[in-house]
Structures are given as C-alpha cells and as structure tokens.
C-alpha cells in the first residue's frame, strides 16, 4: 500500500491502494493497475475514486478525477461525528463513533484516510468482516452519508433543535 498526499487547490488527495492485476490471453499476460483514492476538502466534503489503467500514474489520475466528481457533504460536529453510525458495503461493516477532542482518528488503513479527508479530527472507528480496502472505503462513505445533524433531524420531525437535543 502506498500513501501519497498531494494538494490540488484546497483538496486533500490520498492514495489508499495500488494493485497490479493481470489478464491472461493467448500470447501471455497483460498487466494493468488499479488505484483507490480518497479526496476531501478538509471541511466536510469527501469522495472516493477507483481507476484502472495500463500504467500506475494513469490509474491514479483516473481515480482522482472520479473521486473529485463523487464528492458528498458530511455534517460534522466541531471536528468529530454527530453520533455513532454504522455503514456497510458487501462483506465490510464499519462502526464509527464520536470521540472527545484530542483523541485523534483511531481507525485502520482505508478508514483513517477517509475520515482524515473529511476533516473528522477525533473519531473512533472499527471495521468488521472483509477488510478489502475498496469495500471498507465504500462502507465508511455509506456510514458518513447515514449521519444526520440535529438540524436535519429537527427539520424532518418538525421540531426545534432544542427539543431534539433535550
């Protein structure tokens, strides 16, 4: 696994995994490369991309472009999550919960990169089941998408934020 951080404007780009795959044909093997990347603006927007190409730089470039196109907003609460949240994708399940300030990101591999790109500075996260980086990133993005801010819940229920927070 390679970890590369670049700054494109205000976006943080993180390379999570590069994989060599081969296709066997009559004349031998054809090698190509896949790249998994996460992009975030450090202000609650995050996206991931998966690119394939015959060369590593081209695969990374394609993955970064897809990640920039697939960005979504995440409602954070002063550098941590709003509430404990679960996410799943195929065999990977992710549980993420808020942590007090100064805790840092307690997460493994692909989850740490996705949480850091979304600017969640303090969160505890655990992955269950498959630890395939692609599925873990998709499950993490699913969990972040399922997270609701008190304002969103109050608007949905037609109550005030004070009523929701108790």
Curated annotation (Swiss-Prot):
InterPro entries reported for this sequence: Ribosomal_Su5_D2-typ_SF (IPR020568), Ribosomal_uS5 (IPR000851), Ribosomal_uS5_bac-type (IPR005712), Ribosomal_uS5_C (IPR005324), Ribosomal_uS5_N (IPR013810), Ribosomal_uS5_N_CS (IPR018192), Ribsml_uS5_D2-typ_fold_subgr (IPR014721)
Q: Its function?
A: With S4 and S12 plays an important role in translational accuracy. Located at the back of the 30S subunit body where it stabilizes the conformation of the head with respect to the body.
Record note on quaternary structure:
Part of the 30S ribosomal subunit. Contacts proteins S4 and S8.
**What other note does the entry give for this protein?**
Fifteen X have been added to this sequence so that it corresponds better to orthologs from other subspecies of Buchnera aphidicola.
Its keywords, alphabetically, are: Ribonucleoprotein, Ribosomal protein, RNA-binding, rRNA-binding
Q: Which residues cross the membrane?
A: none
Name of the featured protein: Small ribosomal subunit protein uS5
Name the encoding gene, please: rpsE
Q: Which GO terms describe its molecular function?
A: rRNA binding; structural constituent of ribosome
Which GO CC terms are listed, alphabetically? small ribosomal subunit
Q: What is known of its domains?
A: The N-terminal domain interacts with the head of the 30S subunit; the C-terminal domain interacts with the body and contacts protein S4. The interaction surface between S4 and S5 is involved in control of translational fidelity.
Q: Which GO terms describe its biological process?
A: translation
UniProt-listed Gene3D superfamilies: 3.30.160.20, 3.30.230.10
Q: Which residues form the S5 DRBM domain?
A: 11-74
Family label: Belongs to the universal ribosomal protein uS5 family.
- Pfam families, A to Z: Ribosomal_S5, Ribosomal_S5_C
Q: PANTHER family annotated for this entry? A: MITOCHONDRIAL RIBOSOMAL PROTEIN S5 (PTHR48277:SF1)
